[in-house]
Amino acid sequence: MLFLGDMSIPNSECGEKLIADMKACGVFANQTVIVNLEGVLHHENPKDTFWKVYNDRSAIGLKSICKKVIFGLANNHIYDYPEQIQPMLSLLEEEEIPYFGIAEKDGTFSPLEFEENGVEYAVFGHCWEVYTKTNRNTQTDDRIVDCSYQKLYRDVILYMNSHPGRKVICFLHWNFDMEEYPFPAYKKLAHDLIDYGVEAVIGNHAHCKQEIEMYHGKVIAYGLGNFYMPDGYFFDGSLRYPAESHKTVGVEISAGGGILLHEFETDTPDGAALKLIETVTLEQQKELLRPESQYNENAYEDFFKKNRIKRKITPIFNTYDDSIGNKLRTSYCIWKINAIRVLKQYRDKHQR
């Protein structure tokens, strides 16, 4: 089973190139691939891409080169084109492509259940509510999973108690853009999930690679980076990422629990969509298997405070409970991001 980061395919030409390059990499053919579909499958290349991200329908073609492809939908850009959510879900069902991360209209949710090599799995998807509340769906009643982290933890535990033979994986859309380190709260949440028996915790959204750690024999990948989000197409062509965002990693988990890391270069300067750099064990990957993974909670809080990238009047989440303090921090983040969006959108509109 192979987990990949954020994917946004702007048009059929890019989709065909990506699929051809994936095939040439030689690591996808016999895999169940789980990838974050960053943005809806759009029925046509949209003309309005101002501050929006989507996927061309050529993304469906991934199923032709993999044993199975599964799309994670719990991300904020699904709300960029709300009118396309139901057509997307219908298309995925028609194409027999499993997906997860969509909530019921009342906010309740269930994992995707499937079988792999005789082993039963369940995958939970979740998006940090800061992002769904700064990019709201005001057009339809479709919802992605964005409950509080405390509720997510409790619901995962309830599910595991009622499904004791099933291996559970959590696929989480969290953290700030370009933040290299997970919040201390994310460490605690991931550790608590593993302590209760979750098989793996996989994170996305930061658009850069983050730490990967082995905790009690289970893998936690806090951020896989951009699997494929090419520069110069989205946000009316203005969305571009720094060089470090063009390196990404795929985490392969075998039925026996073995871990391989597939390191890729994506959207390369020479025009390739994807190139395989190397495949290594986690123990061989010193860049991602970082010393701070061995820190205790207090030491990591100090490390994060000193080394975090996002600093300007930005709160730190040290716990994931529903405390008043965390609710205030969350509300402040929502206010700050909304204010920044308004200012940047005003600037960008007048530069078009």
Language-model features and meaning:
Residues N11-K23, E115-V168:
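Binuclear metal-dependent hydrolase catalytic cores centered on His/Asp/Glu-rich metal-binding motifs
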Residues K67-I70, P184-V249:
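Conserved beta-sheet core of the metallophosphoesterase superfamily
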Residues I70-D142:
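Extended active-site neighborhood of metal-dependent phosphoesterases/phosphodiesterases
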Residues E44-I65, R166-V198:
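Active-site-proximal segments of metal-dependent phosphoesterases and phosphodiesterases across multiple
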Residues F3-G5, T32-E38, K68-N76, Y99-A103, ...:
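Active-site neighborhood of phospho(di)ester-bond hydrolases with catalytic His/Asp-centered motifs
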Residues P10-E13, L41-E44, N76-L89, K105-P111, ...:
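Active-site environment of divalent metal-dependent phosphoester hydrolases
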Residues M1-Y54:
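N-terminal active-site segment of His-dependent metallophosphoesterases
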Residues N11, S238-R352:
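A short C-terminal boundary segment appended to hydrolase-like catalytic domains
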